[in-house]
Amino acid sequence: MSQFSKDQVQDMYYLSPMQEGMLFHAILNPGQSFYLEQITMKVKGSLNIKCLEESMNVIMDRYDVFRTVFIHEKVKRPVQVVLKKRQFHIEEIDLTHLTGSEQTAKINEYKEQDKIRGFDLTRDIPMRAAIFKKAEESFEWVWSYHHIILDGWCFGIVVQDLFKVYNALREQKPYSLPPVKPYKDYIKWLEKQDKQASLRYWREYLEGFEGQTTFAEQRKKQKDGYEPKELLFSLSEAETKAFTELAKSQHTTLSTALQAVWSVLISRYQQSGDLAFGTVVSGRPAEIKGVEHMVGLFINVVPRRVKLSEGITFNGLLKRLQEQSLQSEPHQYVPLYDIQSQADQPKLIDHIIVFENYPLQDAKNEESSENGFDMVDVHVFEKSNYDLNLMASPGDEMLIKLAYNENVFDEAFILRLKSQLLTAIQQLIQNPDQPVSTINLVDDREREFLLTGLNPPAQAHETKPLTYWFKEAVNANPDAPALTYSGQTLSYRELDEEANRIARRLQKHGAGKGSVVALYTKRSLELVIGILGVLKAGAAYLPVDPKLPEDRISYMLADSAAACLLTHQEMKEQAAELPYTGTTLFIDDQTRFEEQASDPATAIDPNDPAYIMYTSGTTGKPKGNITTHANIQGLVKHVDYMAFSDQDTFLSVSNYAFDAFTFDFYASMLNAARLIIADEHTLLDTERLTDLILQENVNVMFATTALFNLLTDAGEDWMKGLRCILFGGERASVPHVRKALRIMGPGKLINCYGPTEGTVFATAHVVHDLPDSISSLPIGKPISNASVYILNEQSQLQPFGAVGELCISGMGVSKGYVNRADLTKEKFIENPFKPGETLYRTGDLARWLPDGTIEYAGRIDDQVKIRGHRIELEEIEKQLQEYPGVKDAVVVADRHESGDASINAYLVNRTQLSAEDVKAHLKKQLPAYMVPQTFTFLDELPLTTNGKVNKRLLPKPDQDQLAEEWIGPRNEMEETIAQIWSEVLGRKQIGIHDDFFALGGHSLKAMTAASRIKKELGIDLPVKLLFEAPTIAGISAYLKNGGSDGLQDVTIMNQDQEQIIFAFPPVLGYGLMYQNLSSRLPSYKLCAFDFIEEEDRLDRYADLIQKLQPEGPLTLFGYSAGCSLAFEAAKKLEEQGRIVQRIIMVDSYKKQGVSDLDGRTVESDVEALMNVNRDNEALNSEAVKHGLKQKTHAFYSYYVNLISTGQVKADIDLLTSGADFDMPEWLASWEEATTGVYRVKRGFGTHAEMLQGETLDRNAEILLEFLNTQTVTVS
């Protein structure tokens, strides 16, 4: 408070919680326009600016908030200080000499600068105004203030008083204003509230709420920072009137009605009917007499929780929300961060709704119509720390604004939100008694786009049985090789004849149309002969993997009513052990040659079953899916995702009981190509498999995603001859796809998606490129012969971009399940968009991406895919629950960072059980890939308030028992660190294996924790270590090794890049200062050094550089005083024989003398330097200020005594600020320091601005020019 004397102070008191939050953001983001309110008004008529300025000074005197500054340093708790007197000045700018477009440009430039300028709340008047004169009676008024002093509800009061005074002064008449209550009365009221009672209310209100209501799927992933943008629109006068009447009919407010509509809209973007978002409440307690006339910041953000129970109507929802509002009103003063602490998840609110009014025109006109001017085209700019805000203002035509962060949301998405909001309001006005679940947000235009614009046009191809297509391939080239296995090859003619013999034998034993033949074989030529033989007999085949548990095979044979079992002679004994009483035939029985080799006379319909494939089921037993001949034709004939040729050689690496084999077999056999079947030994050896690809000149293959990743890691040569690799079954790994794309080139990789019920895959994504920003691969677009719809639970189309259930129709949709009419009816429904077609509900979640491809978004249920196998976790749970001694069980699948997944079981046991016993039981019932990797025994399963298992509370599977889950500190040092973390993170108990960031940490808290550790333990812990080893155990291990990586003085940014820049810190002393710079140089690894306080700093810098770049020319960088440090380091490196190619310097002069400064001057300069360098978030915290001062003081003391002498061979590139470019003595000072090339360029901004914000963007372009300049280095 040194800038103000006690005589200037009228009052002092604490801040409201909302003010504290805004002050925090102002400190955290200096120079940014968070919570800046900027109102622009065009004024027509006679405006007396001097009179207006005098009127605003009257308002300044009247309301304490306009004379308030905010102090947060050297006080235990921030306070607001009311000054007795402050003088307000309106800036006048005459633009009458400019053209209209020039005037607009000047005003826009001022507005942008005004936003960037912000307010220094510790000293500035928190309000300013500028009036631009455009013509004699045409003005533009820009009025800005910080939201910390005023909210929208107050603005009408202020404006009304302002114009009352203005009119009186203009007409030289007296005026009188009623007395006002100070804002301090509200602060006093706050301190008297029973906060604990209110916290209990919010805890009960939020109990059971899980997740977060967010538009996460619509967020961009490319940019950081906040770029404000808004979309304004309004309801028509008739719609506004009808909507208002609707609210009144249910005795609620227009604000509550808008919240109800928004709830309906956002529910379509969630997978829950339990929603929460922020609402801005007026916060004016009725207990304070005259509160409606008080001015200040009263508003607060509180959560609005909305439960859309089944069948609830819009009118019912309005009543429920109004009741909630009344109940919560006494507790709406509680700050959001305290309410947040009562919730079960780390972040409760993602976006907010604001219903307020800026009645400038109304307030002005209320006072007088004789004041000589009119205000038109009033525009309000405001920016919060939420990426999306829905704002509305009442009026004859209700104004709605979607204010958003353009770096996070696309304009196209915001436009869709607008359309959906208007569509919902229009429907609800017409029928408020309809269930909200039936409201359709998709208008006619979007509906047409979703139905026809995103799906391929229907194709009129005649369907034929598979035997027809195979015979066509045989006739086309009978002597061409068709099938190869383990060195044996059959031509198309030979394969056809062998299949015909098997078909005839099957028919003699009663297998034909309408029957099922089980194929119980190994990978072999006979496998394919058997499949074709079954089809030619008119039957459907049932692939049975001999490795499956006997009980599972028995169930499949019985459930499918298999008429025959077809196997090999060598598997005769194994087959005999099966509990099967039907006919068993042998594919390789020599008596088959007794049968004729010609085609059997069989009438096959394309809609006849071709095979039955069993997949995991929720009942505890697998379910058999029936796939027809026509289904398979839709997959491999007349398709658009790739072209097939009789010159292709396919490789099959899939289990024949897995539907990927369907593609291998039919795509090759029905298109006259060659099929190579890899044997079991080859499948288990990546080297043998890649050798086989090369030896057999394979050019097409389908692999599960897991196998594709494995092969991609195995080498490159095998990919070079392939013209197409298809992969699917799990989420694709972007790094693996990127590697394969680099080797194979565009258009040769296809990511496939589809369930067994959709016949292998229904969508395909042909990879042409992979932008650096991409983090997941789309599953593509619907293939020809298929249509895809993304629907909600009511089978309505989801809005474009919203997540919903992916549903498939078209030729690939199967007939349903064997003996499961109930499940078939549930999952296979009539297509509501194409009468006569069947629609399959996959249970998968997905959404349309802007480019018309589809993004997979998980499962509705607990089904997972592991290594391509579809697994119902319920099936495993039911098997566990049936095991004697198990009281209850739950199974979860965890996806690791590597992309691998594991199944983990949690059991509550009645008697003492061992994991080995349970695992042995499951192995008898389930395929090996369904047996959990871990078994954890609990006393009871954690439950939600709804009685469901709370899977989020299950312990990590690598922990033994729940009671042993937490491991506390092991020594005094760990206890101290745990206590620091506890205070910084607001957590009561910290274990040594708890992740700092998982507990709510972020970069600012990491800086705070590191500063506290140094202060209390004397350990100089690099902040970057918390990102690399974010547990107390990890820190301990690091310290035991003495920080043995040797890199504690360097922060490495853009770690994956190869080209390195070594950056020396400015006088503030921390490499983190270059965090913003690194984002503008994404192609360079930026190794940013901290200032090393020890005297051998140059040797240590040289050692670090040697570790990080052992060879090759070096690039050094410095900003301000860091340039001198870089120069000294370059001399040391050149002495050691290293080649320094260039030193890039930003705004520095060569130090040629010692500065004569005493300790007090150093201290004040350090304080000033820290104030200038507050742009970086990580360096802007009171908690780290002591550490920053120490580091800055050390560097400053070194720098003032430094004299830069000698020369380097390195080139020197100097980028100066605009002002320094005009100082020739600065420009020349570094030229004599190099025998190499010396370049100077004029940059943008002042010295302090050069590496900040938009100025940095422009200067980074010049730095890139320097970096891209090639010079010859002579050693």
From Swiss-Prot:
The modification O-(pantetheine 4'-phosphoryl)serine is found at S1003. GO terms for cellular component: cytoplasm; cytosol. GO terms for molecular function: ligase activity; phosphopantetheine binding. PROSITE patterns: AMP_BINDING, CARRIER, PHOSPHOPANTETHEINE. Keywords: Antibiotic biosynthesis, Ligase, Phosphopantetheine, Phosphoprotein, Sporulation. Binds 1 phosphopantetheine covalently. Pathway: Antibiotic biosynthesis; surfactin biosynthesis. Residues 968-1043 form the Carrier domain. Its cofactor is pantetheine 4'-phosphate. GO terms for biological process: amino acid activation for nonribosomal peptide biosynthetic process; antibiotic biosynthetic process; lipid biosynthetic process; secondary metabolite biosynthetic process; sporulation resulting in formation of a cellular spore. The active site is at S1120, D1147, H1247. Residues 1059-1271 are annotated as: Thioesterase. Belongs to the ATP-dependent AMP-binding enzyme family. NCBIfam families: AA-adenyl-dom (TIGR01733). PANTHER family: FATTY ACID SYNTHASE, NONRIBOSOMAL PEPTIDE SYNTHETASE. Probably activates a leucine. This is Surfactin synthase subunit 3. The gene is srfAC.
